[in-house]
Structure formats: structure tokens, C-alpha cells
Amino acid sequence: MNLFRALLTVSGFTLLSRVTGLARETLIARAFGASQYTDAFYVAFRIPNLLRRLSAEGAFSQAFVPILAEFKNQQGHDATKALVDAMSTVLAWALAVLSVVGIAGASWVVFAVASGLHSDGQAFPLAVTMTRIMFPYIVFISLTTLASGVLNTYKSFSLPAFAPVLLNVAFIAAAVFVAPHLKVPVYALAWAVIVGGVLQFLVQLPGLKKVDMVPLIGLNPLRALRHPGVKRVLAKMVPATFAVSVAQLSLIINTNIASRLGQGAVSWINYADRLMEFPTALLGVALGTILLPSLSKAHVDADSHEYSALLDWGLRVTFLLAAPSALALFFFATPLTATLFNYGKFDAHTVTMVARALATYGIGLVGIILIKILAPGFYAKQDIKTPVKIAIGVLIVTQLSNYVFVPLIGHAGLTLSIGVGACLNSLLLFLGLRKRGIYQPSPGWLRFFVQLVGAALVLAGLMHWCAINFDWTGMRAQPLDRIALMAACLVLFAALYFGMLWVMGFKYAYFRRRAK
């Protein structure tokens, strides 16, 4: 498998997902701005998203994919299919029960996540109602995650990468065609989540059928629980869930703090999140997606050299592409925010608030993306306890940082704390891989960094000049001109960065690597 071609495939569909995601956020921003309605929706949407990351997308993927790869490479098709059927049965039934409990206790859940909304007589009940509507989303997205894990293990990356686009399409359709006809327009967004969750699973069925891995959900989850592969996955999910829950606990605490910083703070951070997740998904998630199955196979084959080489390739690609992305978030935060969101009720003040959060995200972006590359180095070896221990320490540091940064820079202090924590997390993961002899750096890193820093310094200067010499919020009345200027700047940035690297003798051929 050509790793770079696989990366381009996943990144291409992820780019489509993020573009449609930005379109959805732009429509929501234009319709609702940063108001009690958006605060209520984003708090409500964060709840099933947190549970999704805990039970499905995060802990489940980390535990399931390495074991699935082991079954595929060592036990054959029939045993692998039996594992998929049993796992889908357990997952569907467990999360269906959790959904019922969540719907019944929605008011308590919202209070726990964003107690600051409780004093708002309108936002709190809105958040509770939308939480009840969206809770079943975790059932559909868990099946989607299982399907994605299966397809990725079979080196089929296109459909899993495309699936999130359908959630954004559902949002856009709801905002444009449904919301204007509802008494409470924001409820349309909640129903879009459910529709999008169903579509994300259905679109992957053709790919599953092609490899004869369509999951069959049984009526007896207790019998499925006795499958030895399921037992192993669940045993790995315990520390994996704890690892992911530590990160999500940090998000919950930050949401709670943001809800106490005044109206709009939750939304400011959410809009910054959308922009920060753009490079994170295009690079970090895409690389993690293609590396985990290949790392798992190298582990099963006991090929330590290939294992280390895969990590080395992933780290170099990360630094190559994450560095300019981080500079863009830091130096170009206001232009990016204004171009994408400065329409309708999204005024200049909101642009400033979002840009502050986005710029501080830029400080920690490389660390955030590196985690997506380094953590699979442990997961593929079915070692989840080490990332757990690191995550606990990082949670403490992150929250202590909030006490320092939030009083100084308000809501931007929350995003800065996340970045600081991510950098510490990635450093400790790297040291752990080196200490265990899992990763041995290939020759040429010093030259690579010298070239990278040289190109980055020149790029930073150009970005800063473009940011301060154009009135990005003042171009609100000429949106097409502003979009054209943004496109021209981004093309210029890319040409300068990669051109400078080429002038300094950078070897791009290294990145055309094949996995065994």
C-alpha cells in the first residue's frame, strides 16, 4: 500500500468533510450568530459527541482495530466475521440502553456539562430538549465507527473518510430548508444529527458487503459477550475508555468554565474548534487512520524495523505539514475567522473573540496532531495503559494552566491550556516510545529541522504582513473579494513554503513510502 497515496485519499475526503463542515458552521453563524440558541445547541451536541468519543470513536477504535487486524492476519475470514458480528451486537445493545438512560436524565447531564446555563431560563431547557433528541446518535455513530474500523483494516479508506460529509449535508439541509418552518428553528439542527448518523452508517454498507463483513446485530447480547475476541476488546476498552475519558473530562471542565465567562464564550470556542480541527483532521486523523492498521500488521508480523519506519514517516509528514498550519492559526487567525464566519449576525466583535481563541490553539497545534501519530504506536502493540498514565498527568497540568491563563486572557486561556497540555502529552508519548525501543529515528532529522525552521520563519513573516495590511473585517460588504484575497494568500503561502524547502535541498521523494 502506498502510504502517501492513502494519505491523499483520506485527506481529500476529509477536506470535503471539513469544507462542508465550514459551510454548515457559516450557515449556523449567519442564522443564529453567537447567542443563547447556539450555546444551547453546542452544549447539547457536545454531550453525545463526548459519549461517542468515549464509547465508540475513541476507546473502541483503539481497542478493536489491533485485535481485528490480528484476527484477519492470523485466523482467517470466518473468525474475523464472527468477531465483527459479536462486537456489533454488544455495541448496539449497550449504547441503546445508554441512550434511554441519557434521554431520561437529560437535565442532569446538561447541568453537569454546563452548569452555567442553569441560570438562563431559555438556554437551559433548550439544551435539555436537544440533548434528548440527539442522544440516540451514539448508537448510529458507534456502528459507523465499527464499519470504519473494518474497512480501514481491509485497507479501504474512501467510504469511512467520506461518511462525515453526510452529517454536514444533513445540517445544511436542516438549516436551509427545515429551520425556517419551525417554531424553535434551532431544533432542526438537533434532528439533523440523527439523520446524519443514520446516513453515515448506511453509506458504508456497500464497502462492507464487498469484503463480506456486513455486521449482523443479534438478539442475544449476552451470548455475543462470551466471544473471546469481544472479551479481549472489552478488556482493552477499560483502560482505553479511561484514557479517552481523561481528555473528554478536560473538555467538560473547559465547557463548564466557558459557560461562566459570559454569553457567547461557548460559541467563540466552538467556532475556533471548527477551524483548529481542519488541519487536525486533514493531517492528524488521516495519518492515524492509515497508520494504525499498518502498525498493527507490523506488530503481528514482529517486524520492528517496519514498525519504527512507519512511525518515522508519520512524524516527518506531521512536522512538514503541521508547522505551516500552526503558523496560519497563530498569525492569520483574524483573516481566517472573518473570511469564513463574518456574515449576518456574526459581527466584528465576535470575529475578534474567535480569533483570540484560534491564535492560542495555533501554539499547541503541532502537539495536538503529534498525539494522533504517537498514540497509535502504543495502541497497535495493544498497550493502552501507558497513554492512560500520561493522559492523567496532562489533565492535571491542563487544568492547573487554566488557573494561570484564564484570568489573564479569558476564554482564549482555555484553548491555550489545551495546547500546552497537548505538547506535553506528545512529548511524553515520544519519550515512552524511545525508552521502550519501539521507535528509532532514521538519519537526517537535524537537516530536516533546519530546513523546516528556515522555511517557517519566512512564511511567518509573510503571513503577519498579509494579516495586518488588509482590512479583513472591513471587507464584509465585499465577500467575494475577501474570499478571492484569502485564496490568493493561501496559494502564495503554500508556494513560498514549499519553494523555500526546495531551494534548501529538501527531498520530497522520501514521503512516497509503501507499507508492507
Curated annotation (Swiss-Prot):
Entries under Pfam families matching the protein: MurJ
InterPro entries on file: Lipid_II_flippase_MurJ/MviN, MurJ
Regions that span the bilayer: 93-113, 133-153, 159-179, 188-208, 233-253, 275-295, 317-337, 358-378, 390-409, 448-468, 483-503
UniProt keyword annotations, A-Z: Cell inner membrane, Cell membrane, Cell shape, Cell wall biogenesis/degradation, Membrane, Peptidoglycan synthesis, Transmembrane, Transmembrane helix, Transport
Topology term for the membrane: Multi-pass membrane protein
Pathway per the UniProt entry: Cell wall biogenesis; peptidoglycan biosynthesis
Consequence recorded when altering R24A: Lack of activity
Superkingdom of this protein's organism: Bacteria
Cellular component GO terms held in the UniProt record: plasma membrane
Inactivation phenotype: Essential for growth, it cannot be deleted. Under non-permissive conditions, conditional mutant shows growth arrest, dramatic morphological changes and cell lysis. Depletion causes accumulation of peptidoglycan precursors in the cytoplasm.
PANTHER family according to UniProt: LIPID II FLIPPASE MURJ (PTHR47019:SF1)
Function: Involved in peptidoglycan biosynthesis. Transports lipid-linked peptidoglycan precursors from the inner to the outer leaflet of the cytoplasmic membrane.
Full protein name: Lipid II flippase MurJ
